[in-house]
Amino acid sequence: MRTIFLCLFVLALTTACDKDKPETPKAQLQVDIQPVFGGQTFYMDSIYTTQEGYKVKFTELKCYFTLFGNGNTSLHEAALLDYRETGSLLFKKEEDYTKFPSLSAVLGVDSSLNHLDPSAFPNESPLNISNAGPMHWGWSTGYIFMNIEGKVDTIPDASTNTNVSFSFHIGTDTYLQGLQFNNINWAD
């Protein structure tokens, strides 16, 4: 009986050992966008002065970026920069960053995605209607690519009375902008 128990114990021990090499975890790849205004780092709700002397305060900055990749290697289909909610963070993804010494993307929602049914995108996609919310106009015009809102002082003087609201909602396929980033240094 002891012999059977010993054999079963040794058998269990040898089969429980994992001889496969542990999988190397992929690095967390993170893309940040840092907006600037007139060469200054952009901060929401700060007051800036235009070249003409007008004071302006931005209260909303949102924009879509799509089709991140490098040649035929796709990285990320779509991301929404919501500067008030997430700051400069555009997206994080577990990926081998060495595949991306350069990166291309589209500022806006690429025409291959812009006119699709927004409810058909996966729930976690920023293009899904429940996530896009007011950033989607409708099926014919598609998504708002960039939403910039704020307040401005219409009298160029020493006052900082930013009391006139403005809103720019930019979209439609005409305003797509291709982006290319070369010689990327991914920080550790």
What does each model-found stretch correspond to?
Residues L13-A16:
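C-terminal motif of bacterial Sec signal peptides marking the signal peptidase cleavage site
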Residues M1-I4, D18-K19:
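Positively charged n-region of N-terminal signal peptides that target proteins for export
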Residues D18-D188:
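A short, solvent-exposed, low-complexity linear motif enriched for acidic/polar residues
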